[in-house]
Amino acid sequence: ALADAALRQCMPCGPGDRGNCFGPSICCGAELGCYVGTAETLRCAEENYLPSPCRAGGQPCGAGGRCAAPGICCSDETCSLEPACLEEAGERGGEPAQKNLTGLDASAGDFLLKLMHLAANRQQQGGKGPLL
């Protein structure tokens, strides 16, 4: 409980500072998705120099990660698709996820959903290697 009290929100990052740093090269937000190793994550390296620990994201997921964006679980080193994080987005109202999908035409939205389900099923089956 004492450790939880010492945690602060991780630094903002990404376009319009609408995301939060999850690690030195990971920036995620509900409306943004996740950036890994891009210019949007450069600011996140500064977290290593701050004296107090931080925590970003929602519910715990995966191996030491937290829900970072709808359907995505990130630790400080990596991100993966996580169906439980889709459920969390729905519990919060799901507005950002739905808003992002409505901007796509029907075929692009269907393709994205099929790709997310394929990746989630492959992960549950312990599949290794590329998705496609």
Swiss-Prot record:
Q: Which UniProt keywords apply?
A: Cleavage on pair of basic residues, Disulfide bond, Secreted
- Which GO cellular component terms are attached? extracellular space; secretory granule
All disulfide bonds of the chain are 10-54, 13-27, 21-44, 28-34, 61-73, 67-85, 74-79
Q: Where in the cell is it found?
A: Secreted
Q: InterPro entries, per this entry?
A: Neurhyp_horm (IPR000981), Neurhyp_horm_dom_sf (IPR036387)
* Molecular-function GO term, any one: neurohypophyseal hormone activity
Determine the domain of life of the protein's source. Eukaryota
Q: Does the keyword Amino-acid biosynthesis apply?
A: no
Coiled coil segments of this chain: none
Its annotated function is as follows: Neurophysin 2 specifically binds vasopressin.
- Write out the similarity annotation: Belongs to the vasopressin/oxytocin family.
The protein's name is Neurophysin 2
